[in-house]
C-alpha cells in the first residue's frame, strides 16, 4: 500500500512539473494584476497558513490591493481595498454574482441548491425570497421576540446562579447554546438541545467551515484529489453531511406528522407547504429543503454567537467602554429587568459597540468567493471569465488609510458621526458583504446580538479568567480556519450588578 502511494506521488509530481514548464513557454498578452512568486503544481496554496485572511493581507501589503494568485491552476483574484471592492460588488456586480463550487461545497449544498452557493439566477432569487419572507424579514424578526426573551432569560438565570456561588462559566459555550436554542425555535419550531440524535452546533459548524475552506489541495488540483482519502478530509466531509442530514430528516419527519395541528407554522412548516404545492414558483425536493434548513439554522447560529463572544471579549479588555455601555443601558432600560428589542433601538453606544466588533471581527473575514462569468477590465487589468474572487473584508476594515493609525484598536466612538450600516452601502465597511450577494440575515442576527449583549451587560459585572500562558493576548488569539472564533473559550466570573 505504501509503495503504491509513493509511486502515485512520483508520477503525479512528474506530470504536474511537465505541465508547469509547458505553461512557462506560453507568453500571454494579457495585462494581469501583480502576483507573488508561486510554486509548481500548488501555486500559492502554501502561503495561506492557518489564518488565510492575515496571510492574504500580508501578501497584499507587498503586491497591492488587487492581486492575482494561483490555487493549483485556478486563478484567484484577491481584493483588499474598498476601492476595488466597490468595482467588484457594485460596478461589475452582475459579472461577479456567481459562486465557484468546490467538491465539498457541491456536496454540502446539494449541487448549489442552497442560498450561499446557488448560481445567480431564478432559482437563487426564489430561494432568497422565500427565506426572507418566511424567516428573515423585519416582520418575522419582530414576531420572534418572545422566543428570544425566553432563551435569554434562561441564560440570565444560569449566570445568576454562577454569581451567587462565585463560580466561573464558559460564556462561549453558554452563548452558542442559547443562540442555537433561539434558532431552533425560530427555524425548526422548537429547541432540540438535550434530545437524543441532536447535534453539537459549535463542533459541526467548525467542521463545516473547514470543509468549505481554502486549504484542501484536492479542491484545486484534481490530480491530487486522492490526498483527501489519505488525510481523512473526505471521510470527515461524509460524516458532517450524514450527521446533519440525519438530524434534519428527524426534524422534517416530526413536522410532517404535526403540521396540521399547529396554529402558528414555523419556517420548516412553510418550506414543506411550498414543497407540496405543485404550482409554486420554486420547486423544491427533500434534499433542497435539507440544505436550506441547514444554512438558515447553522449560519445564523455561528455568526451571531461569534459577534456576542467577541463583543464581550472586547468590552472586558476595555473597562471604560464597558462602563459607558452599562450606563447607557441602565439609563434607557429602567423599568424591567429584561432589555427588549424595542429598547435597544434607542441605545446609540450599543449600536456603536456592535459596529466596532463587526469591523474588527467580521463573521467571515474572507467573504464567500465569487466567480467571474465574463471577461472584465478591473483597474486597468484584464481579468478573464472563470477567475475566482476573494474579498478580504478583514483587511479592508482594518485599513489605516480609511480608519486611521488606530485601526487595530477597539474604539466604538469612531462610529458616532458615521452613517454606515451593515448593508454594504459603503465599501469601507462590509462585514456581511454587499451587492446582490449581500447576506440576507443581517436583521435577525443584529437584533439577537444587540438584545443579548444588552442583557448581559445590564444584569452583571464581569471578571475574565486568566487565559493560557505563552500568548501575549490569549483572549484575542483566533482559532485556525476561515472563521474568526476565539481559539480559547471565554471563561468569566459574573457578579450581579
Curated annotation (Swiss-Prot):
Superkingdom, natural source: Eukaryota
Main enzyme class: oxidoreductase
Annotated positions binding heme: 439
PROSITE patterns cross-referenced by the UniProt entry: CYTOCHROME_P450
Species in which this protein is naturally found: Arabidopsis thaliana
Family: Belongs to the cytochrome P450 family.
Gene Ontology biological process terms from the UniProt entry: triterpenoid metabolic process
Positions of transmembrane segments: 1-21
Pfam families reported in the protein's UniProt record: p450
Protein name: Cytochrome P450 71A16
Gene, per the UniProt record: CYP71A16
InterPro entries, per the entry: Cyt_P450, Cyt_P450_CS, Cyt_P450_E_grp-I, Cyt_P450_sf
Entry keyword set: Heme, Iron, Membrane, Metal-binding, Monooxygenase, Oxidoreductase, Transmembrane, Transmembrane helix
Function: Possesses triterpene oxidizing activity. Catalyzes the C23 hydroxylation of marneral to form 23-hydroxymarneral. Catalyzes the C23 hydroxylation of marnerol to form 23-hydroxymarnerol.
Compartments, as annotated in UniProt: Membrane
Topology versus the membrane: Single-pass membrane protein
Cofactor names: heme
Entries under Gene3D superfamilies matching the protein: Cytochrome P450 (1.10.630.10)
Gene Ontology molecular function terms on file: heme binding; iron ion binding; monooxygenase activity; oxidoreductase activity, acting on paired donors, with incorporation or reduction of molecular oxygen
UniProt entry tagged with the keyword Oxidoreductase: yes
EC number: 1.14.-.-
Main location: membrane
One annotated Gene Ontology cellular component of this protein: chloroplast
Keyword Heme: yes
CDD domains assigned: CYP71-like
Amino acid at each position: 500500500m505504501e509503495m503504491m502511494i509513493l509511486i502515485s506521488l512520483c508520477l503525479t509530481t512528474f506530470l504536474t512539473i511537465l505541465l508547469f514548464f509547458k505553461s512557462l513557454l506560453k507568453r500571454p498578452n494579457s495585462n494581469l494584476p501583480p502576483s507573488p512568486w508561486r510554486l509548481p503544481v500548488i501555486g500559492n496554496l502554501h502561503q495561506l497558513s492557518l489564518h488565510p485572511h492575515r496571510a492574504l493581507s500580508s501578501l497584499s501589503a507587498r503586491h497591492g490591493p488587487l492581486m492575482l494568485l494561483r490555487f493549483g491552476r485556478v486563478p484567484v483574484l484577491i481584493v483588499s481595498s474598498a476601492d476595488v471592492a466597490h468595482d467588484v460588488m457594485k460596478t461589475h456586480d452582475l459579472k461577479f454574482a456567481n459562486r465557484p463550487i468546490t467538491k465539498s461545497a457541491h456536496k454540502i449544498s446539494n449541487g448549489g441548491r442552497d442560498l450561499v452557493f446557488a448560481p445567480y439566477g431564478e432559482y437563487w432569487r426564489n430561494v432568497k425570497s422565500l427565506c426572507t419572507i418566511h424567516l428573515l424579514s423585519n416582520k418575522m424578526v419582530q414576531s420572534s421576540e418572545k422566543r428570544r426573551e425566553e432563551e435569554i432569560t434562561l441564560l440570565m438565570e444560569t449566570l445568576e446562579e454562577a454569581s451567587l456561588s462565585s463560580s466561573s462559566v464558559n460564556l462561549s459555550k453558554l452563548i452558542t447554546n442559547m443562540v442555537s436554542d433561539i434558532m431552533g425555535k425560530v427555524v425548526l419550531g422548537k429547541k432540540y438541545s438535550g434530545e437524543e440524535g441532536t447535534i453539537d452546533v459549535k463542533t459541526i459548524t467548525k467542521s463545516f467551515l473547514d470543509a468549505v475552506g481554502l486549504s484542501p489541495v484536492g479542491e484545486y488540483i484534481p490530480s491530487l484529489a486522492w490526498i483527501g482519502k489519505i488525510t481523512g478530509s473526505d471521510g470527515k466531509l461524509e460524516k458532517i453531511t450524514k450527521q446533519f442530514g440525519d438530524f434534519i430528516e428527524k426534524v422534517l419527519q416530526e413536522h410532517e406528522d404535526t403540521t396540521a395541528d399547529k396554529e402558528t407554522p414555523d419556517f420548516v412548516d412553510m418550506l414543506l407547504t411550498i414543497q407540496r404545492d405543485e404550482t409554486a414558483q420554486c420547486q423544491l425536493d427533500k434534499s433542497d429543503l435539507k440544505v436550506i434548513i441547514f444554512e438558515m439554522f447553522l449560519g445564523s447560529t455561528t455568526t451571531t454567537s461569534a459577534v456576542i463572544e467577541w463583543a464581550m471579549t472586547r468590552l472586558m479588555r476595555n473597562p471604560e467602554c464597558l462602563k459607558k455601555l452599562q450606563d447607557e443601558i441602565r439609563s434607557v432600560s429602567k423599568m424591567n429587568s429584561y432589555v427588549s428589542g424595542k429598547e435597544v433601538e434607542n441605545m446609540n453606544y450599543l449600536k456603536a459597540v456592535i459596529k466596532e466588533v463587526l469591523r474588527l471581527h467580521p463573521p467571515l473575514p474572507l467573504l464567500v468567493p465569487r466567480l467571474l462569468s465574463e471577461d472584465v477590465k478591473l483597474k486597468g487589468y484584464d481579468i478573464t471569465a472563470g477567475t475566482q474572487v476573494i474579498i478580504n473584508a478583514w483587511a479592508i476594515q482594518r485599513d489605516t488609510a480609511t480608519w486611521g493609525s488606530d485601526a487595530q484598536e477597539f474604539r466604538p466612538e469612531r462610529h458616532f458621526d458615521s452613517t454606515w450600516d451593515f448593508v454594504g452601502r459603503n465599501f469601507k465597511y462590509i462585514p456581511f458583504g454587499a451587492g446582490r450577494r449581500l447576506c440576507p440575515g443581517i436583521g435577525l442576527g443584529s437584533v439577537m446580538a444587540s438584545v443579548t449583549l444588552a442583557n448581559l451587560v445590564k444584569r452583571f459585572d464581569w471578571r475574565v479568567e486568566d487565559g493560557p500562558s505563552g500568548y501575549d493576548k490569549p483572549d484575542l488569539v483566533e482559532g485556525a480556519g476561515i472563521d474568526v472564533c476565539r481559539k480559547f473559550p471565554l471563561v468569566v466570573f459574573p457578579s450581579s450588578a
